[in-house]
């Protein structure tokens, strides 16, 4: 491998981590996109129709919204989402979130105790 390939991979890794952190720390995205996806996934698991490959598409709606908001908040006026976060990077973020949140759901992270208001 060439040195430039290592640099590109490191940059992509940083972009993936940056966008993932932005998503996990944005209250509006959490309420508007994240929790409805979690609810949908829990419903699909309960009905035994969960398909991990199809769930990536659901997470992409969240990731695309987050990428647009990130560029709007931190980017310059001439930057485009596709330049800052290419589709491969956004897909990788969706995959990371899908894997992590499936594990969290299986561990009962989003199960509300009986008698609580959610």
Residue ranges and their predicted role:
Residues 2-118:
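Acidic interaction surfaces
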């Amino acid at each position: 491998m060439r040195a430039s390939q290592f640099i590109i991979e490191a940059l992509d890794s940083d972009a993936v981590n940056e966008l993932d952190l932005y998503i996990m720390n944005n209250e509006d995205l959490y309420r508007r996109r994240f929790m409805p996806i979690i609810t949908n996934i829990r419903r699909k698991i309960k009905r035994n129709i969960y398909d991990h490959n199809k769930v990536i598409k659901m997470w992409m709606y969240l990731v695309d919204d987050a990428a647009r908001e990130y560029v709007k908040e931190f980017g310059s006026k001439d930057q485009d989402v596709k330049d800052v976060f290419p589709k491969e990077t956004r897909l990788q973020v969706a995959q990371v979130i899908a894997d992590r949140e499936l594990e969290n759901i299986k561990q009962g992270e989003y199960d509300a105790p009986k008698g609580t208001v959610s």
